[in-house]
Curated annotation (Swiss-Prot):
Name of the gene this protein is made from: ENG
Compartments (UniProt record): Cell membrane
Ranges for region OR2: 47-199
Tissue-level expression: Detected on umbilical veil endothelial cells. Detected in placenta (at protein level). Detected on endothelial cells.
Domain ZP: 363-533
Glycosylation sites: 88, 102, 121, 134, 307
Annotated consequence of substituting residue 52 to V: In HHT1; impairs protein folding; abolishes expression at the cell surface
Protein name: Endoglin
Organism per entry: Homo sapiens
Gene Ontology biological process terms in this record: artery morphogenesis; atrial cardiac muscle tissue morphogenesis; atrioventricular canal morphogenesis; BMP signaling pathway; branching involved in blood vessel morphogenesis; cardiac atrium morphogenesis; cardiac ventricle morphogenesis; cell adhesion
Disulphide connectivity of cysteines: 30-207, 53-182, 242-330, 350-382, 363-442, 394-412, 493-549
Length: 658
């Protein structure tokens, strides 16, 4: 057996050989008191929210989610991740996320490939990195009006109130609620739609069990019942700083009957749980637990019965999906290894890296402006003694709530190139002996040119302005001269076919729209590329169209205020397959008319021959006159009473006109 699996294998053996518990009649004397973070810390991820709702809107074009976030004081940092899986090979529908906060937030947003529209208050939310999504300014409304504002744009799929979150995971397309309308209700379980981790760790308490000798310690985790009673698996990660070979810890897990446990521990431990449990190294091996008391006093009695002399951690949590326990010692003994050398600054000292990331760069009227808000500086506990450009004579102005540094492109040491104006922001901090420096840039938009090109092959060599239905087309967007400090991204594209064909969406929210639109790898110079396949399923086919794409130049590092958006377009000619002259792809019009006339002539000759044979083989006595009967009037009208449909088109549609 591998040595890495030996400790947990021993723990598994101990758990399976444990005796069933018996209740203690005597009162357990153990005064639970808060334990400092140096002795133990418990963090958790949960789907329980103070107020929330989940509703189903399967036919909605826009999936709407609303988050109300309450933070205690000052600016906070938040990680927000959106997850979505492809459905039938295509990206999910468009998403509107409404973000309402009560104070300043540094937001790290991850929504890769999701067609996201973000509504937020730009004066309170600061992105640590450019978001790369469509944004909308959120009006300053109370909660009820924000919900109404969001509902006007589409049925709300989920809404939740969270108190001081550190990270949020929002899963799209996972709504399992039975409601058709989302209305906030107290103490809700968001299920798989939303999980979040509170910033403040759970309250950890501990005590000494009287009358028990030895050094065995107990870690007790009590998970409280949630709003829903569906089966749940709680992953419990335990990390104890114990010497290898020690076997003096017991883990007691108590929860509702529908909760099972998946244990991931780095140390040999005796396991005592309700429900069923398994170990991470043997996830398929489920072990039946015991019936344990559901009160703190009863669980302390279990710990004493298991000969634990110390309750190192006692934690009560809402229904969680992941719980992490970190304890600095084991068995009641002090840690013998030397204390680790501190390599990161304490939380109450200034972080120069984060401070420099808060400098906002604005470019307008042939001038560069740097802005640094004092509120954010104070929250980081930084004391600034100076903010200048590379030229120290160009100093920032103190405008009450912010520092503002402004200069024309022709002064303060600006470096002007064909595509960019560059300088350096220099910040002097009281706690640092050397100044902090950061490169700042402005784009010279007068010198930039955006081009949209259509190609007939994936090699992008032969440019064209003609597309043919059923033939794949390749598109590339370029900016010249290239700007290495900025990233060129494709936000949206559509093909306008006029009143006959309407508009065909190709790309929305940086995601392919349809299963025959493919986002390709960028060119070696970083130019975005994609391909599409177009079919028409009614006639007549339009002869021209306009391909329009919206692109964005986003800084690889820095503020989203420097983003530049442009729309480029090109006129396209559309060749109908039956007029292309390529006989291998279909018969041209003269050939069709010739075949039709030939078939008519052959049919007429055969009919005449049959009539001649019939008339000459019958006896004269049986011949009867032929009476011509006029066809009903309705037959003539029915042959011409057909509907003429308008032209419709779609990327990769397989329908055809009968």
């Amino acid at each position: 057996m591998d040595r890495g699996t030996l400790p947990l294998a021993v723990a598994l053996l101990l758990a399976s050989c444990s005796l069933s518990p018996t209740s203690l009649a005597e009162t357990v004397h153990c005064d639970l008191q808060p334990v400092g973070p140096e002795r133990g810390e418990v963090t958790y991820t949960t789907s329980q929210v103070s107020k929330g709702c989940v509703a189903q809107a399967p036919n909605a074009i826009l999936e709407v989610h609303v988050l109300f976030l309450e933070f205690p004081t000052g600016p906070s940092q938040l990680e927000l991740t959106l997850q979505a899986s492809k459905q039938n090979g295509t990206w999910p529908r468009e998403v509107l996320l409404v973000l309402s906060v009560n104070s300043s937030v540094f937001l790290h947003l991850q929504a890769l490939g999701i067609p996201l529209h973000l509504a937020y208050n730009s004066s309170l939310v600061t992105f640590q990195e450019p978001p790369g999504v469509n944004t909308t300014e959120l009006p300053s409304f109370p909660k009820t009006q924000i919900l109404e504002w969001a509902a006007e744009r589409g049925p709300i799929t989920s809404a939740a109130e969270l108190n001081d979150p550190q990270s949020i995971l929002l899963r799209l397309g996972q709504a399992q609620g039975s409601l058709s309308f989302c209305m906030l209700e107290a103490s809700q379980d968001m299920g798989r739609t939303l999980e979040w981790r509170p910033r403040t760790p759970a309250l950890v308490r501990g005590c000494h069990l009287e009358g028990v000798a030895g050094h065995k310690e107990a870690h007790i985790l009590r998970v409280l019942p949630g709003h829903s009673a569906g089966p749940r698996t709680v992953t419990v990660k335990v990390e104890l700083s114990c010497a290898p070979g020690d076997l003096d810890a017991v883990l007691i897990l108590q929860g509702p009957p529908y909760v099972s446990w998946l244990i991931d521990a780095n140390h040999n431990m005796q396991i005592w749980t309700t429900g069923e449990y398994s170990f991470k190294i043997f996830p398929e091996k489920n072990i039946r637990g015991f019936k344990l008391p559901d009160t703190p006093q009863g669980l302390l009695g279990e710990a004493r019965m298991l000969n634990a002399s110390i309750v190192a951690s006692f934690v009560e949590l809402p229904l969680a999906s992941i719980v992490s326990l970190h304890a600095s010692s084991c068995g009641g003994r002090l840690q013998t290894s030397p204390a680790p050398i501190q390599t990161t600054p304490p939380k109450d000292t200034c972080s120069p890296e984060l401070l420099m990331s808060l400098i906002q760069t604005k470019c307008a009227d042939d001038a560069m402006t740097l802005v640094l808000k004092k509120e954010l500086v104070a929250h980081l506990k930084c004391t600034i003694t100076g903010l200048t450009f590379w030229d120290p004579s160009c100093e920032a102005e103190d405008r009450g709530d912010k520092f503002v540094l402004r200069s024309a492109y022709s002064s303060c040491g600006m470096q002007v190139s064909a595509s960019m104006i560059s300088n350096e922001a220099v910040v002097n901090i009281l706690s640092s002996s050397s100044p902090q420096r950061k490169k700042v840039h402005c784009l010279n938009m007068d010198s930039l040119s955006f081009q949209l090109g259509l190609y007939l092959s994936p090699h992008f060599l032969q440019a064209s302005n003609t597309i043919e239905p059923g033939q794949q087309s390749f598109v590339q967007v370029r900016v010249s001269p290239s700007v290495s400090e900025f990233l060129l991204q494709l936000d949206s594209c559509h093909l306008d076919l006029g009143p006959e064909g309407g508009t065909v969406e190709l790309i929305q929210g940086r995601a392919a729209k349809g299963n025959c639109v493919s986002l390709l790898s960028p060119s070696p110079e970083g130019d975005p590329r994609f391909s599409f396949l177009l079919h028409f399923y009614t006639v007549p086919i339009p002869k021209t169209g306009t391909l329009s794409c919206t692109v964005a130049l986003r800084p690889k590092t820095g503020s989203q205020d420097q983003e530049v958006h442009r729309t480029v377009f090109m006129r396209l000619n559309i060749i109908s397959p039956d007029l292309s002259g390529c006989t291998s792809k279909g018969l041209v019009l003269p050939a069709v008319l010739g075949i039709t006339f030939g078939a008519f002539l052959i049919g007429a000759l055969l009919t005449a021959a049959l009539w001649y044979i019939y008339s000459h083989t019958r006896s004269p006595s049986k011949r009867e006159p032929v009476v011509a009967v006029a066809a009903p009037a309705s037959s003539e009208s029915s042959s011409t009473n057909h509907s003429i449909g308008s032209t419709q088109s779609t990327p990769c549609s397989t329908s055809s006109m009968a």
